[in-house]
Regions:
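Short, solvent-exposed mixed-charge patches
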Residues: 20, 149-150
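A cross-family detector of function-defining hotspots
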Residues: 33-142
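Residues at structural and domain junctions
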Residues: 5, 21, 89-90
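Sec/Tat signal peptide C-region and signal peptidase I cleavage site
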Residues: 15-21
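Sec-dependent N-terminal signal peptides
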Residues: 3-15
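Short N-terminal segments immediately surrounding and downstream of signal-peptide cleavage
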Residues: 21-38
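Generic cytosolic/nucleocytoplasmic N-terminal low-complexity/intrinsically disordered segments
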Residues: 1-2, 61
Length: 150
């Protein structure tokens, strides 16, 4: 399930970034809603169906990477796109909610139980690598999960 979710996440982000300008706002809204639902379902979050979110989108171009950010009460999910082809190369999930973090950590533990050779800070998915990092801000503590090229 976690591999399917991550594949869906990458595919959705890639498709959203390749949409034509007149279609982008509507498509991004649908894609973001799908990502929010998928991410919630992945960790067993019942609130995912009704979760409120907002989207920030800055297209790639002129040697500037593109960015799409989905903000919810539980997390901030950032997609970074290569400026040459607008393909998503990194996903950063900053978790704000203790419940969501607990559920996501449980998902990580299941992965590491099934893959005992991996260290406890990474999870592999195809040619991508999900890396765990601790960050903090003045108002709250985040745990970030970053998907990058291997």
């Amino acid at each position: 399930m976690k591999k399917l979710f991550l594949f869906t996440l990458m595919l959705t982000a890639a498709l959203a970034m390749q949409a034509q300008a007149s279609y982008i706002a509507e498509q991004l809204g649908r894609d973001a809603h799908h990502i929010v639902q998928s991410l919630g379902a992945c960790v067993g979050n019942e609130r995912a169906e009704s979760q409120q979110f907002d989207i920030t989108y800055m297209p790639a171009g002129n040697n500037v990477e593109g960015v799409m950010i989905i903000n919810t009460a539980d997390y901030r999910c950032t997609f970074k796109m290569d400026p040459r082809d607008e393909i998503c190369y990194e996903i950063i999930l900053d978790v704000r909610s203790a419940d969501f973090l607990r559920d996501f950590n449980r998902l990580f533990q299941v992965y590491h139980t099934e893959n005992p050779d991996s260290d406890d800070k990474t999870m592999h998915f195809g040619d991508k690598l999900i890396r765990v990092r601790e960050t903090s801000s003045t108002t709250s503590r985040f745990r970030s999960f970053t998907m990058t090229e291997k």
